[in-house]
Amino acid sequence: MNDYILFMHHDAAGTDAASDAGLWARYLARLRGTGLFDGGSAIGPGERLRKGTPGRPCDDDLSGFVRVHAESLSAAKELLLPGNPVYEAGGTVELRELPRS
């Protein structure tokens, strides 16, 4: 079983739907029911840091993340449907494997 992270981008045309608490509650309940859910959170403002340069604000392009377990990237993609509010509203969900190193 592999670990994956789904980054929700803040680019959905239907921003109200993408941030609807009721839709998120239903989606997360479904994920919990699969036994594959491993946490998640909204993402707030932050700062980009680089040695020797002043910090600068992060872009406001990420709104949250969800972490899941799945056998493959294809299996992790299936966890978007039905119901990921950002995906359903036409927004971008970035899916990345979290390799064990």
Positions of predicted regions on the chain:
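Conserved, structured core segments of small domains
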Residues: 1-101
